[in-house]
Amino acid sequence: MVKKSFILVIPQEEKKGSVEFQVSSFTNKIRRLTSHLELHRKDYLSQRGLRRILGKRQRLLAYLSKKNRVRYKELISQLDIREPKTH
């Protein structure tokens, strides 16, 4: 398994309960699970876990987008993730 360096976007004094910290930790988990699933395609339990984490991250990003658009844009660019489609 290829391990990539984890993203350290949030400073240490930032609270672990903050939206930015949660989104960055979910992004780390998503990247780890994605590399795992490239090797183990039939690991359906991990696929389900990945979908759950993706949904949680999407909901947190939607919340942050509504509350503070500037912080949302900064976080999206720092984590190098795409902006979700809006319906």
UniProtKB/Swiss-Prot annotation:
Keyword Plastid found: yes
Keywords: Chloroplast, Plastid, Ribonucleoprotein, Ribosomal protein
Any one Gene Ontology BP term: translation
GO cellular component entries: chloroplast; ribonucleoprotein complex; ribosome
One GO MF term attached to the UniProt entry: structural constituent of ribosome
Coiled-coil ranges per UniProt: none
Any Pfam family matching the protein: Ribosomal_S15
Domain of life: Eukaryota
Compartments where found: Plastid, Chloroplast
Oligomeric form and interacting partners: Part of the 30S ribosomal subunit.
Similarity comment: Belongs to the universal ribosomal protein uS15 family.
NCBIfam families: S15_bact
Protein name in the entry: Small ribosomal subunit protein uS15c
